[in-house]
Design a protein with these regions (language model features):
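Active-site-lining helix/loop region of Rossmann-like oxidoreductase modules
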Residues: 6, 141-209
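Rossmann-fold NAD(P)-dependent oxidoreductase module
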Residues: 14, 18, 114, 162
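NAD(P)+-binding Rossmann beta1-loop-alpha1 motif at the extreme N-terminus of oxidoreductases
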Residues: 1-38, 42
Length: 209
């Protein structure tokens, strides 16, 4: 796939690494173009662009910014008509220990309102950056899960195919409204990692008997 990654922080860097390793064509952008250039230089199939040029002919946009910056970052890309936007954000408080919105809406639903011409899908939000960068295999050869929620079948299929290309199991989590559940799940994972001291090599998964 041809994929634009928006954000050069820990999650954006982890995506650039894994997408490049899987053979995807990656276009990287962020608030500081120099950071994007440094990141892109580390990987094959990766290039850096200012926001206005970052979309190019990408099929998919991975939104790897803070939630507060999400709408502005997406709108800076230009025309998103028909594009699949994978929202990995969580609406976290400053101390990362709570969510700023929830129950009656979600980060994904608010982002979808901001870019109604795009197909928004929630995915990857329950993974720490370290886990994403290290890949889907855990202890005892267990594979981690990526939960995928969207009102668009195409967006859901695209995010599912992308996650599977990186080696992850996927769970169909229904419509975008279920981001209201996935974001608190990420919040619990963050608490367990930092608040309960379990570290950042953990992730929620879904088991079948």
């Amino acid at each position: 796939m041809k994929i634009t990654v928006v954000g050069t922080g820990n999650m954006g860097s982890a995506f650039a690494k894994q997408l490049s390793s899987a053979g995807h064509i990656v276009r990287i952008t962020g608030r500081e173009i120099e950071k994007a250039k440094v990141l892109a230089a580390q990987f094959e199939n990766a290039s850096a662009f200012p926001a206005a040029e970052a979309l190019g002919d990408s099929d998919v946009v991975v939104l790897a910014t803070a939630y507060a910056d999400a709408a502005t970052a997406l709108q800076s890309l230009g025309d998103l008509t028909g594009k699949v936007v994978i929202d990995i954000t969580n609406p976290l408080s400053a101390d990362y220990m709570s969510l700023t919105i929830g129950h009656v809406t979600s980060a994904s639903e608010e982002i979808a309102k901001a870019v109604p011409q795009a197909h928004v899908v929630k995915a990857f939000n329950t993974l720490f950056a370290q886990v994403l960068a290290d890949g889907p295999t855990f202890s005892d050869n267990q594979r981690g899960s990526v939960f995928v929620a969207s009102d668009s079948d195409r967006a859901k299929q695209t995010a599912t195919a992308l996650a599977q290309s990186l080696g992850w199991k996927t769970v169909n989590a229904g419509g975008l409204v279920n981001a209201r559940y996935l974001e608190p799940l990420a919040g619990l994972n963050i608490y367990l990692g930092y608040g309960a001291g379990l570290g950042t090599s953990i992730a929620p998964t879904w088991l079948n008997k």
